């Protein structure tokens, strides 16, 4: 183990963040790398603070010596007005989930998109990317779609129950990636879309413990499809289980969660995290939750 002298104080700002696994992943990786690394959840609900207080919290974090903050709902857009600099990809997405505090300046990044991109590259390195169907065009869905197009997807069919949001998101993404086609679709079109698709990406709450079930008719899955889910509580969603049973290559939601954490760790410390080690720890944490549930 290294005898590094560096110490880091970081935090997670958002509603209901106390159960988050992110602090545990960061602190364990810091320990292994020989850092003094403390990661504190800052739960707005417990503090009785609105999302609009994020600017004040940034200033307080600076005064108290924080090196950076992760930002989650409802502050990913609200934080934008309080930053000195925003990374180009985060600016395009209109959302920041990681802020580095250095020399009194606040710089915003988005590791939602980079975390999924890293997960896709490591977990499904040989995935065909000609045509992909994505379910969900909300905040996380926007970042994932951006990552897919950055990775080289040529035709992205974006499906969301909110037709207006879906159309707006598709138009934005098409403007950023003129060499790819991005089309807003409806769930009614899935029986026609899936036979043409190489892969399926799921970015809605369906499958979470509080929203059980599958996000589409699972009979539409074929063994030739690859399937990615961003839900990780539980890690084996109904979609993930059925896709594996059909012989699909599968990327579970834990991959993106670890990818986000590893990239944020790098931004905060300047050191590369060991993503495989972080995933092993993440799976330990999830398994422990399932035992106590």
Swiss-Prot record:
Entry keywords, A to Z: Amino-acid biosynthesis, Aromatic amino acid biosynthesis, NADP, Oxidoreductase
Catalytic activity: shikimate + NADP(+) = 3-dehydroshikimate + NADPH + H(+)
Biological process per Gene Ontology, one example term: amino acid biosynthetic process
EC top class, as a word: oxidoreductase
Biological pathway: Metabolic intermediate biosynthesis; chorismate biosynthesis; chorismate from D-erythrose 4-phosphate and phosphoenolpyruvate: step 4/7
Superkingdom classification of source: Bacteria
EC number(s) reported in the record: 1.1.1.25
Chain sites annotated for binding shikimate: 20-22, 72, 97, 112, 232
InterPro entries: Aminoacid_DH-like_N_sf (IPR046346), NAD(P)-bd_dom_sf (IPR036291), SDH_C (IPR041121), Shikimate_DH-bd_N (IPR013708), Shikimate_DH_fam (IPR022893)
Cysteines engaged in disulfide bonds, as pairs: none
CDD domains membership: NAD_bind_Shikimate_DH
A single Gene Ontology CC term: cytosol
Entry binding sites for NADP(+): 136-140, 230, 253
Active-site feature positions: 76 (proton acceptor)
MF-aspect GO terms: NADP binding; shikimate 3-dehydrogenase (NADP+) activity
Gene3D superfamilies xrefs: Leucine Dehydrogenase, chain A, domain 1 (3.40.50.10860), NAD(P)-binding Rossmann-like Domain (3.40.50.720)
Keyword Cell cycle carried by entry: no
Ranges in a coiled coil: none
Function: Involved in the biosynthesis of the chorismate, which leads to the biosynthesis of aromatic amino acids. Catalyzes the reversible NADPH linked reduction of 3-dehydroshikimate (DHSA) to yield shikimate (SA).
Protein family membership: Belongs to the shikimate dehydrogenase family.
Subunit and partners: Homodimer.
UniProt-recorded name of the protein: Shikimate dehydrogenase (NADP(+))
Species of the source: Arthrobacter sp. (strain FB24)
């Amino acid at each position: 183990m290294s005898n590094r002298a560096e110490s880091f104080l970081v935090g997670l700002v958002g509603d209901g963040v106390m159960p988050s696994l992110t602090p545990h992943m960061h602190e364990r990786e810091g320990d292994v790398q020989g850092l003094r690394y403390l990661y504190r959840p800052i739960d707005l609900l417990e503090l009785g603070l609105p999302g609009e207080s994020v600017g004040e919290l940034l200033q307080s974090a600076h005064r108290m010596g924080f090196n950076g903050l992760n930002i989650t709902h409802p502050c990913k857009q609200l934080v934008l007005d309080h930053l000195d600099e925003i990374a180009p990809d985060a600016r395009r997405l209109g959302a920041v989930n990681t802020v580095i505090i250095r020399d009194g300046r606040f710089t915003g990044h988005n590791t939602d998109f980079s975390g999924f991109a890293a997960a896709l590259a490591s977990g499904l390195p040989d995935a065909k990317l000609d045509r992909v169907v994505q379910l969900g065009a909300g905040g996380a869905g926007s970042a994932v779609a951006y990552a897919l197009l950055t990775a080289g997807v040529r035709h992205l069919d974006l499906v969301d129950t909110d037709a207006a949001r879906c159309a707006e998101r598709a138009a934005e993404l098409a403007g950023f990636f003129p060499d790819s086609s991005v089309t807003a679709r409806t769930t009614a079109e899935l029986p026609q879309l899936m036979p043409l698709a190489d892969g399926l990406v799921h970015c809605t709450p369906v499958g979470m413990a509080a929203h059980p079930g599958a996000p589409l008719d699972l009979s539409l899955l074929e063994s030739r499809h690859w399937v990615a889910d961003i839900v990780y509580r539980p890690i084996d969603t109904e979609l993930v289980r059925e896709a594996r049973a059909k012989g699909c290559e599968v990327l579970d939601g834990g991959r993106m969660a670890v990818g986000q954490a590893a990239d944020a760790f790098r931004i905060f410390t300047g050191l590369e995290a060991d993503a495989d080690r972080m995933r092993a720890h993440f799976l330990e944490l999830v398994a422990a939750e399932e035992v106590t549930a």
